[in-house]
Design a protein with these regions (language model features):
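A charged N-terminal "starter" segment
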Residues: 1-153, 157-158, 195, 199, ...
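Active-site loop/helix belt of alpha/beta enzymes
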Residues: 2-3, 168-311, 407-409
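Conserved active-site and cofactor/substrate-binding residues in soluble primary-metabolism enzymes
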Residues: 52-55, 59, 80, 84, ...
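Short, solvent-exposed polar/charged micro-motifs at secondary-structure junctions
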Residues: 60-66, 83-87, 212-214, 298-300, ...
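Structural preference for beta-strand elements that scaffold enzyme active sites
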Residues: 72-74, 95, 116-118, 139, ...
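Active-site beta-loop-alpha junctions enriched in small/polar residues
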Residues: 76-82, 99-102, 122-124, 143-147, ...
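Short acidic, glycine/serine/threonine-rich loops at helix termini
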Residues: 86, 109, 129-133, 151-154, ...
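Charged (often Lys/Glu-rich) extended helix/loop segments that serve as interaction or gating elements
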Residues: 270, 276, 280-428
Length: 428
């Protein structure tokens, strides 16, 4: 359940200046989202902070349930381990996909019962398994014979899901090697689970984080169907299929600054058809689970940051570059900035002259920057240190990946709006 990322260093690029009346230097956000409340909160903020719109998250949850009725949601906690967000999702009926005993404990504090929490991490020590079992969790993901043996010893009688590997094709983060096993190994794993006194409960997949194609879901379904058919011959009848995460956010840009436009309607159609296909294959009725993370929270979180400096420097190759340094970056809110771009808004500069700049965070790490290949951002030339910058669609992983004081920069505080009246939190 830990995402693989690749760091990128920032090569030199030419920049040009031109006049524009655009409010920002990038394409507008999808019209599907009502950003009225979150924009008002950004405007009201007088210091840097992350803002979560609980009402927006609730609308997103309702839309997901409407597209996939009957599917049990297990929110991927790693995407947004903020107590108020978790409490709100629990009240809506969500359970939780936890990756550690610490996440399990946090999930339990929302008031959900342990049967709405599964230990979705295939990587866990004997101690982790025993702790989760003591906390009441009985559903464990697995992908190896060694892990099955450990679960049998430290969580006797537990239910196991075997994670079947996918290629990760079409996703920004593929998750294809560290997690999951081949369909052939899945048969061995579930055979071993049964022999060890565990309940072979289900199969799971993950098509990759920020999946951009519907075909990935279709391929995953075919792989699951093949395993189910083989299990029928072995006399193993499963109860549940966990379709994992991967549903995308809509408000971010690719690393070149182009809007990402995943075919969400087609994805849902393929998933619905896939569930029917798997029901016809399995020897008994199937329940389905889903582990959305960024899909629920990314587009309903934003950061109020400020400008550290807009500077112009000549590089060793003779090119001149403009750099916009922000008060937050990869290590305190924008961890994924090397693989995608967040939409920036400059509320104090609705027009005027713009320059194309590399956007970077405040730390002394050169990875703390947008990957600038053909993806320079239009920035108001007149913007000054201290002026606000609004960063949209960064509600996923903003708090989870933040460091604790790298270079002395502390995690951002957060505010939750909507829900039962909103609340202010401490550092993320």
């Amino acid at each position: 359940m830990i995402r693989q990322t690749t760091a990128h260093r920032a090569p030199a690029h030419h920049t040009t200046a031109h006049h524009s009346t655009a409010h920002t230097g990038i394409a507008p956000a999808p019209a599907a989202y009502d950003r009225t409340a979150i924009r008002a909160a950004l405007a009201a903020a007088t210091d840097d902070r992350i803002i979560y719109d609980l009402d927006g998250i609730e609308r997103q949850y309702a839309a997901l349930i409407g597209e996939l009725p009957g599917v049990a949601v297990r929110f991927a906690m790693k995407a947004c381990p903020v107590d108020e967000v978790l409490d709100h999702l629990a009240a809506l009926g969500s359970g939780f996909d936890a990756a550690s005993p610490q996440e399990i404990d946090q999930a339990l504090r929302t008031g959900v019962s342990p049967d709405r929490i599964h230990y979705g991490n295939t990587i866990k020590s004997d101690r982790n398994i025993a702790q989760a079992y003591r906390l009441g969790v009985r559903d464990f993901a697995t992908d190896s014979l060694e892990d099955v043996a450990a679960i049998a010893e430290h969580a006797p009688g537990a239910r196991v899901f075997c994670r079947v590997a996918t290629t990760g094709d079409g996703a920004l983060w593929g998750l294809s090697r560290k997690f999951g096993c081949s369909p052939e190994d899945a048969l061995r794993v579930l055979d071993a689970a049964r022999a060890a006194g565990l309940t072979p409960s289900g199969l799971s997949v993950h098509v990759g984080s920020q999946q951009m194609t519907a075909e990935a879901w279709g391929a995953a379904v075919e792989s699951l169907a093949a395993v189910l058919e083989a299990l029928n011959w072995r006399g193993i009848t499963l109860e549940r299929i966990n379709l994992g995460g991967g549903l995308p956010a809509l408000g971010v840009l690719d690393r070149h600054g182009r809007p990402l436009d995943p075919p969400l309607d087609k994805m849902f159609a393929v998933i619905r058809d896939g569930m029917e296909r798997l029901r016809t294959v399995n020897a008994a009725p199937l329940e389905f689970l889903l582990e959305p993370g960024r899909h629920l929270v990314a587009d309903h979180g934003a950061i109020r940051a400020h400008v550290a400096r807009l500077s112009s420097r000549r590089q060793l190759d003779g090119t001149r570059e403009d750099w916009l340094y922000l008060s937050c970056g990869k290590f305190n809110g924008l961890y994924e900035m090397d693989e995608l771009q967040y939409r920036l808004e400059f509320p104090t500069h609705p027009g005027g002259q713009f320059v194309n700049a590399v956007v970077a965070g405040p730390t002394c790490d050169s990875d703390d920057a947008y990957a600038p290949e053909d993806g320079l951002v239009r920035v108001p030339r007149a913007i000054a240190s201290g002026e606000p910058v609004w960063i949209h669609s960064c509600g996923a992983y903003a708090t989870a990946y933040t460091t604790r004081g790298f270079n002395g920069f502390e995690p951002l505080p957060y505010t939750c709006i909507g829900g039962t009246g909103g609340s202010d939190g401490g550092a993320a």
